[in-house]
From Swiss-Prot:
Residues 1-18, 145-146, 196-197, 235-239, 294-306, 389-394, 438-525 are cytoplasmic. The gene is STT3A. A motif (SVSE motif) lies at residues 357-360. The keyword Chloroplast does not apply. It comes from Oryza sativa subsp. japonica. Its main location: endoplasmic reticulum. Residues 453-507, 759-787 are annotated as: Disordered. This is Dolichyl-diphosphooligosaccharide--protein glycosyltransferase subunit STT3A.
């Protein structure tokens, strides 16, 4: 009766332990979610509830329109306040995931009588989904390496600076929800791989659909998963679970992706998606081979194998030929400009300068890796090693995700955001394995220390004898069933016989060797735990600093510290408020495309170009106007019905991201469409200068005049704090533009086009002067015989 009671007590204890572990795990995940949300609120605490950057202002404006007019009007919205006189169809050119998500949250809160404004919901959408991303990271890592690694990875992702940079409160951009969708799609794919459940496969397709709605980076998913499927096939890991995980994703995911207006038929017509279809065909060929192998004898299987391979190769070659024909018909070979710039990092700088001009599309520097992922860079190799011990479908997918993300992040700094989850997952796995080994070593050493104590020496002989008898009996009992189990399995083939022998011989010996290898000395284990805790402390301090100082400042409100304290530069909102209150509603404002979204959203004025950059010719026209002399620029702007021109200037306060520093991109983009604009005309010996050594073309262009007009009056010298020298042309007047507003710190300057002169009056003057000249020279002039 004692043995059943002890077994039931042990079972009850294990159930209680599992229940307590589940509650503790849920509570830890809740704390991780709170951490992920709260660490992103520094921007609201330090400044106010304000939208950040440039693109979020367009998303905020679209969300306002959706909440006010409904989803039907949203899909059919033609915006006449952007890209004048062309306009823009919003419903068919925007990824609607972020807008629909925030609009749904706003509708639910107002349905529950929680009257929050649309702006407040937009500001806090990114912190909310950062918590969701942390929980999705836990689920993905748990499928790969267990609960401990999942909790560690979730905690690391909640604080990683690379993700914080795009998910602070106010950063209302597509990546705010897309990173969660990316991680959750990967989790459902791995979950389907591990379970073979068609339910999870369907959820995976729906999650992929949400990712397509949210961000153009969905092409990373539809290319990474086929690569992993192909890797599993090549390494002999094909199974029915792999088929269930991939086939529904391609079919359902492609059909759902085609429903998104901004994607449409691109889901089946562009080169970014062709790899998924090719792997889909290969997967079916492999599945057919495995199916036939189970039905036929070995001799018939060889004949059928050759037939299937022949037909499969013929089909693959036919599909490849069709794809090549489709790709060859496109000038960009079926790839988008951004995709080509990822495959060939020099493509954008050679052919599409508008893409290369965006700072997010530049390659990162080495310090940016240590800034954005910090100590995780040193933990990733250990995580890779842990994934190979042992290697599973889930762990191989995580390693493949890391390798591809590292490459793409090295091409484009914006894709550091895609690298962050992979780095956190592998770092979490490495830390979990390290803590597991170190704590087990400490536990073993402590138990050994207590077992060797004098108090327990009296019972040691009896316990050792009983333990030895039990161990010998258990060893015998363990070896016997192994022999009986391996005996019938030795029949099929020699390879299986060798494998089963190796497994049978290694099973009873392996645990003893592992225990000896994993046990470390007490001092080394305690020191290792302390070092890992200190390393984690440094990581937390760095993440909090990055969240509070580096990534919380909105670009529309700038701050600077000096001996006098903190100085706030609110020039952008000051300029947009002036435009809103002192200009007509239908007035057109011209500026470089960086400020188009903000001008439309905050000043409610029509702009010529904005951050969508869908029409390179229109942007080149504005760049040409800025690069031209004053009169030629006035004619270009006047042809576009422009009434005001806005420029950003940082020479007085030292703001480096001004239009003078961006000017060469205007020249390059304008020169790509209008050949008379040549970059060497603006350079002196290959150097870009605006001082006395600047070229006449540079010192007489419109951008120079609008930025430096009356600048010499500030200090009497015209010293530019950004460039670090005095300007070349200090005293000049404007003939076709007049200054109407300059902000407090001279960061934003607004000019108005002067009206056209009275042409009738000018003609009369010319006629009078012409008649006098003709009368005086008539005597000495001979008559033209051809008149």
């Amino acid at each position: 009766m004692a043995e059943p009671e002890s077994s039931t007590a042990a079972a009850g204890g294990s159930r209680l332990r599992n229940a307590c572990g589940g509650v503790l795990c849920a509570f830890t995940l809740l704390l991780i979610g709170v951490l992920a949300f709260s660490i992103r609120l520094f921007s609201v605490i330090k400044y106010e509830s304000v939208i950040h950057e440039f693109d979020p202002y367009f998303n905020f404006r679209v969300t306002q329109f959706l909440s006010k007019n409904g989803i039907y009007e949203f899909w059919n919205w033609f915006d006449d306040r952007t890209w004048y006189p062309l306009g823009r169809v919003i419903g068919g050119t925007v990824y609607p995931g972020l807008t629909l998500t925030a609009g749904t949250i706003w509708w639910l809160l107002n349905s529950l009588n929680i009257p929050l404004s649309v702006e407040t919901v937009c500001v806090f959408t990114a912190p909310i989904f950062s918590a969701n991303a942390s929980w999705a990271t836990y689920l993905l890592t748990k499928e790969a390496k267990g609960t401990g690694a999942g909790l560690m990875a979730a905690a690391i992702l909640a604080m990683v600076p690379s993700y914080i940079s795009r998910s602070v409160a106010g950063s209302y951009d597509n990546e705010a929800v897309a990173i969660f969708a990316l991680i959750f799609t990967f989790y459902l794919y791995v979950k389907t791989l591990n379970t073979g459940s068609l339910f999870y496969a369907t959820l995976n397709a729906l999650s992929y659909f949400y990712m397509v709605c949210s961000w153009g980076g969905y092409t990373f998913i539809i290319n990474l998963i086929p690569i992993h499927v192909l890797l599993c096939i090549v390494t002999g890991r094909y199974s029915s679970r792999l088929y269930i995980a991939y086939a529904p994703l391609v079919i359902l995911g492609t059909l759902l992706a085609a429903l998104v207006p901004v994607v449409g038929f691109n889901a089946v017509m562009t080169s970014e998606h062709f790899a998924s279809f090719l792997v889909f065909i290969i997967l079916h060929v492999v599945a057919l081979v495995y199916y036939i192998k189970g039905l036929l004898t070995p001799r018939l299987f060889k004949v059928a194998m050759t037939l299937v391979i022949t037909v499969g190769l013929a089909v693959c070659f036919a599909v490849i030929a069709i794809l090549i024909a489709l790709v060859a018909s496109s000038p960009t070979k079926g790839w988008s400009g951004r995709s080509l710039s990822l495959l060939d990092p020099t493509y954008a700088s050679k052919y599409i300068p508008i893409i290369a001009s965006v700072s997010e599309h530049q390659p990162p520097t080495w310090p940016s890796y240590f800034m954005d992922i910090n100590v995780l860079a040193f933990l990733i190799p250990a995580g890779i090693i842990s994934c190979f011990l042992p290697l599973s479908d889930a762990s191989s997918f995580v390693v493949l995700y890391l390798v591809t993300a590292v490459y793409f992040s090295g091409v484009m700094v914006r894709l550091m955001l895609v690298l962050a989850p992979a780095a956190c997952i592998l770092s979490g796995i490495a830390l979990s394995e390290a803590f597991d080994v170190l704590t087990r070593s400490v536990k073993y050493q402590l138990s050994k220390l207590f077992d060797d104590s004098p108090a327990a020496s009296g019972d040691s002989s009896a316990e050792s004898s009983s333990a030895s008898t039990v161990s010998t009996n258990s060893a015998k009992n363990e070896t016997r069933p192994e022999k009986t189990e391996t005996a019938p399995k030795e029949k099929p083939s020699k390879k299986n016989r060798k494998k089963e022998k190796e497994v049978a011989e290694s099973v009873p010996v392996k645990p003893k060797k592992e225990k000896k290898l994993l046990v470390l000395p007490m001092e080394a284990s305690v020191l290792g735990i302390l070092l890992l805790i200190v390393l984690g402390g440094f990581y937390v301090v760095h993440c909090v600093w990055a969240a509070a100082e580096a990534y919380s400042a909105p670009s529309i409100v700038l701050t600077s510290r000096s001996r006098d304290g903190l100085h706030v530069f609110d020039d952008f909102r000051e300029a947009y408020a002036w435009l809103s209150h002192n200009t007509d509603v239908d007035d057109k404002v011209a500026s470089w495309w960086d400020y188009g979204y903000q001008t439309t959203a905050m000043a409610n004025r029509t702009v010529i170009v904005d951050n969508n950059t869908w029409n390179n010719t229109h942007i080149a026209t504005v760049g040409t106007a800025m690069s031209s002399p004053e009169k030629a620029a006035w004619e270009i702007f006047n042809s576009l019905d422009v009434k005001y021109v806005l420029v950003v200037f940082g020479g007085l306060v030292g703001y480096p991201s001004d239009d003078i520093n961006k000017f060469l991109w205007m020249v390059r983009i304008g020169g790509g469409v209008f050949p008379h604009i040549k970059e060497p005309d603006y350079l002196r010996d290959g150097n870009y200068r605006v001082d006395a050594q600047g070229t006449p073309t540079m010192l007489n262009c419109l951008m120079y005049k609008l930025c430096y007009y009356r600048f010499v009056e500030t200090d009497g010298k015209g010293f530019d704090r950004v460039r670090g020298y005095e300007i070349g042309k200090k005293h000049f007047k404007l003939t076709h533009f007049e200054e109407v507003f300059t902000t407090h710190h001279w960061m934003v300057r607004i000019y108005k086009l002067k009206p056209q002169k009275n042409r009738v009056r000018g003609k009369l003057k010319k006629l009078k002067s012409g008649s006098k000249a003709s009368s005086t020279n008539a005597a000495g002039r001979k008559k033209n015989p051809w008149q």
